[in-house]
Amino acid sequence: MSKVVERFLKYVKYHTTSDENSNTFPSTEGQLIFARELAKELKELGLSEVEVDENGYVTALLSANTDKKIPTIGFIAHMDTSPDMCGKDVKPQIIENYDGNDIVLNKEKGIILSTSEFPELKNYIGKTLITTDGTTLLGADDKAGIAEIITAIEYLINHPEIEHGNVKIAFTPDEEIGRGVDKFNVKKFACDFAYTVDGGELGTIEYENFNAASAKIKIHGRNVHPGTAKGKMKNSILIGIELQNMLPELERPEHTEGYQGFYHLNNFQGTVEETSMYYIIRDFDKQAFSDKKEYIKSIVEALNKKYGEGTVELELKDQYYNMREVIEKHMHIVETAMEAMRSLGIEPKVVPIRGGTDGARLSFMGLPTPNLFTGGHNFHGKYEFIPIHAMEKAVEVIVKIVELYGKKG
């Protein structure tokens, strides 16, 4: 069994689900336990400046082995797994020499990873896959990234003939709940640029992501006995439905792909008296993003005009921005990663991130950080899987990026 697989199978045993309702940082104790174990492993490998700080960030340095002027590169992955699915007691299954048929994840519960629902499986006939047992997520997002980074660093340590500058690594908590770099010290990390290793299928590289905002809406109704309600009742639930129906139907997640943005109603709770709604608003284009926010404001204004001032309250908050505008000023970071892939026989696929990453926020904090593939598929659920050869290729790509910058200086 290769080292990257060994590490990955060990890491997924740690229960590191993050919790958006927690007020602590990190949000769960399990992440701190995992952080300390990773720090211990990094020390054993011989890295310097290994630290788990008070916020649970793990950082370490592989010192340069040459006097050449070479940029300091960072590699970053996150320790938490998504709260969307249970991440406790993960029991990975290894499917050797995959035959192209449906994979029974859990016979007892009738859970099947089917080729009709997940046609990408057909790309991995003859390969070895790691799947879930159908009761939890797998945790390839992002424990595969952690395993790949550490294995690449170990390779560089064992191959001193590869000249390199300083290489920094960081493992962050709470990425899945949007807090991953809230307390990250970019200045102390002291890199010229970095890569998150948090992407999907083999060969993907991502340097543009959604602009993101949240919209919290509170609707104040007026409850009156329905028998005497004529001309008096104001049903906040129905006003909420009216608001939703005023948004463009085709601009919902289920109707969009590629570079298309959306409004997503993520939560709706209400009574006649009071209703709360929570939206996320996403778009790649800056102007379209601004237009979407203005449009939801105009709907709220129209409803307040119709039902009375103060009926609908809107709290609109920007969350993160498209890192493309930062990365485009430093395209050598993307170009070198693509060169590394091609030299290893991997065709790079530039895809937009229909979401956000730690790298998006880091880019606006002064650390340009595109995202590299881990090799995984179907993150955040029981159908998550990862091909072993893709993990091994991710290790090679990280090593090659470091090597190329060592040569370029």
Curated annotation (Swiss-Prot):
CDD domains named in the record: M20_peptT
GO molecular function, one term: metallopeptidase activity
Compartment list: Cytoplasm
Record-annotated active site: 80, 175 (proton acceptor)
Binding-site residues for Zn(2+) 1, renumbered to this chain: 78, 141, 198
Protein residues bound to Zn(2+) 2: 141, 176, 380
Coiled-coil parts of chain: none
Keywords per UniProt: Aminopeptidase, Cytoplasm, Hydrolase, Metal-binding, Metalloprotease, Protease, Zinc
Pfam families noted in UniProt: M20_dimer, Peptidase_M20
InterPro entries documented for this protein: ArgE/DapE_CS, Bact_exopeptidase_dim_dom, Peptidase_M20, Peptidase_M20_dimer, Peptidase_M20B
Reaction catalyzed: Release of the N-terminal residue from a tripeptide
Main localization category: cytoplasm
Cofactor(s) needed: Zn(2+)
Enzyme Commission numbers on file: 3.4.11.4
One GO cellular component, as annotated: cytosol
Record-level GO BP terms: peptide catabolic process; proteolysis
Note on cofactor: Binds 2 Zn(2+) ions per subunit.
Protein family membership: Belongs to the peptidase M20B family.
General function of this protein: Cleaves the N-terminal amino acid of tripeptides.
PANTHER family cross-referenced by the UniProt entry: PEPTIDASE T (PTHR42994:SF1)
Protein's name in the database: Peptidase T
Gene: pepT
